Amino acid sequence: MRSPLARPGASPRAPDLRDVEALVRERGLSLGLPLHVEAEAGSTNDLAKSAARDGAPHGSVWLAESQTAGRGRQGRVWSSPRGENLLFSVLLRPGGAMPLARLPELSLVVGLAVRDAAAKAVGDAAGRLRVKWPNDVVALEGDALAGATDGARPRWRKLAGVLLESQITGSGARAKVDALIVGVGLNVHTRSFPGELGSTATSLALLRAAGAPAEELSRAAVLVDVLEGLHRDVAFVAERGLGLVHARLTAADALRGQRVLAEGPTACPTAYPSACPTWEGTCEGIDLEGKLLVRGDDGVLRRVSSGEVHLGSSGSR
């Protein structure tokens, strides 16, 4: 039965999405089938959550050409022109009763998979595509890429956002992750963004390097590259942690070495968050539990597990 969250009638498959199933089978991936493509949906994450409750299998994917209620972290709206980009959700069933403590680590792994697929699509030999904790994918610009040392904050544009939502069984110490919904919004073909997005967003089409493959950007290829990254890393990290991917994550970390402004209760260095809405420090990387390491101006190193971390009023959020 079709979810009431979707509009009647699956989307006629766009030319650059026709090969998804064939590529998934060709690469022997555990993710990507079945694939549900909708012309329009409220939110692909909502479709996936509803289906997960009804027993949909691990690896199922929901993709929409347009969303009317797309959202990102902290309830932000994610907008995208119809038929230009990738708006999809993947249902993961980690198995083995994955503990809740692994969720921050898996969030980073998803961001890394999206970054790696995007870098392949645009021929990013210079390493300008980075993961901004906890899982946004951004493209460094100008002096930021060259490693400017004049004290200016780096500049980047957002390429992709990730939203993870989980379904939990048990409670307290017995709580485990039964299903994990991975929602991704990745700008592919869009070349013009409205309003303030014109100065803060980018797309694969805009980033494509001169040395990139000559063929047209294929959303199918990019999607399957993301799925391949998740196929490679998710099960391992769910069971054993970030260990083997930590070096790759460190190399792609957009915040490491930067002055950052932290907001939120777990980013506050006092026992009274209401008295400390923001604080500043220098990011020293990401630890093996997926927490951001920030050394405050008082010299104390703190591990940030949630909240908002950005570069302050003069930098990119």
Language-model region placement:
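Short, conserved beta-turn/loop elements at beta-strand boundaries and strand-helix junctions
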Residues: 167-168, 191, 286-292
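Short beta-strand-centered aromatic/proline hotspots
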Residues: 279-286
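Residue-level signal for inorganic ion chemistry
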Residues: 44, 88, 114, 136, ...
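Conserved, helical-rich catalytic subdomain that frames metal- and/or nucleotide-binding sites
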Residues: 209-279, 315-317
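Short, acidic (Asp/Glu-rich) active-site segment that either coordinates a divalent metal cofactor
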Residues: 171-208
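N-terminal lobe of the biotin/lipoate ligase/transferase fold
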Residues: 1-123, 142-161, 270-271, 314-317
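Structured surface patches comprising rigid loops and adjacent beta-strands/short helices at the edges
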Residues: 289-291, 297-317
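Short, low-complexity Ser/Thr-rich regulatory SLiMs
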Residues: 141, 163-170
